[in-house]
Amino acid sequence: MTMTTVTRKQLFINGEWRDAAGGKTIDVVNPATEEVIAEVPSAERADIDAAVAAARAALDGPWGRLSARERGRLVWKIGENLLAKADEIARLETLHNGKPIFESRHIEVPAAAECFQYYAGWADKIHGETVPVKGNYLTYTLREPVGVVAAIVPWNFPLLLTAWKVAPALACGNTVIIKPASQTPLTALALAEIAAEVGVPAGVINVITGPGSSVGQMIVEHPGIDKIAFTGDTSTGKGIMKGAADTLKRITLELGGKSPNIVFPDADLDAAIRGATTGIFYGKGEVCAAGSRLLVDKSIRGEFIDKVAARAKKMAPGDPLDPKTRLGAISSKKQLENDLRYIEVAKQEGAQLVAGGGRADIGTGKGYFLQPTIFDGVTPEMTIAREEIFGPVLAAIEFADVDEAIARANDTSYGLAAAVWTKDIKKAHHVARRLQAGTVWINTYNIYDTAAPFGGYKQSG
């Protein structure tokens, strides 16, 4: 593994790079090597106050005076420059997150760029209405920016989820304060640099780094912030709801999941096997919509699980910077320990380990690598069937018929995504309508489009 120089590692406030007011920093660690690759500021209240003031001034000043079409052009240029710098940005994403460079370079950076370019087209298509009312009066509505928006971003898709929040906010005329996860701040800082290069006015995009427990909390409670857009775990989302209540901020929450991948015996089983493995092992399973529960008809369960396990055993983790690697490093030591704890709990509760189950060594003796892990014989009350692990750990559960498949799929506090595998299109749509999930895929998994909504039921936000 070769090193990449990290050029931007300060706060970005009002178009300027600066250290935190208190001078404190936090380490950014490459999870594949366990080496510190950067130190970034740990912001304090004074830094957040400065970012809010800059965002408010830009909203009331140069950004607010731009026409919608001019604003859209700038948002488009951000996407354009992301693509132009895709190699550099993808490398940063892999270095601080541990995901394979193939995913960063060929999937996630292009998807982030597409997000900016998609929403750029919306900037001049947001209209008010003229309302017919009685009497000799003219009544009309305007759609106005919410104001200063804080985007609190998790560590699993640092760039892409930043784009999901920032692009629509900018297109609608808001200004933004980005709070990346403390483990993965580098691509948010790179994005701020790109925005400045294309001419986005100072104060429109600000980046504040530091721990969520302190910096994130101060952002949530700040009276000068009008809206919070958060992606992360459900418990943190609940805390944000409580913290935002005192100032009655608008919030959007995209939270956890325990998504079922449902395989019926009449499915294309080879395709379903591929879908079951990519559904859980893409992104190392650190995906809110990961297909972490595999529900299989009992008539095919044994052979099907054997084939999924055989495929998983061939997916050895590797150097994330190797273009051939398809399974990278777990994002942090803390997350690896969390994954291993769940694996031990599954064993203790009687689940049958059929693949993986331990740390992996890619030959360096370093790095937070985990074997792709599959448990068979999982029952709905087991911990790994109910709690979000957020790692490459699959729980296989059998069902007897369509009704039991639906009941078991819905037997969760989450409802972000699901998939149905069958050649019977009538059955597919019947099941999809009864599933309590924001996104339901049929005979595929992990297909996203910027034009499609992405939300959930229950505690998925």
Which role does the model predict for each range below?
Residues 56-59, 63, 79-86, 90, ...:
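Structural signal for hydrophobic packing residues in well-ordered secondary-structure cores
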Residues 1-40, 73, 77, 125-152, ...:
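Terminal low-complexity tails and localization/encapsulation signals of metabolic enzymes
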Residues 34, 71, 93, 116, ...:
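Residue-level signal for inorganic ion chemistry
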Residues 37-43, 60-64, 151, 261-264, ...:
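Short, well-ordered beta-strand elements within core beta-sheets of diverse protein domains
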Residues 235-379, 403, 408, 442:
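ALDH superfamily catalytic-core signature
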Residues 33-38, 225, 262, 317, ...:
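Conserved C-terminal structural/oligomerization subdomain of aldehyde/semialdehyde dehydrogenase
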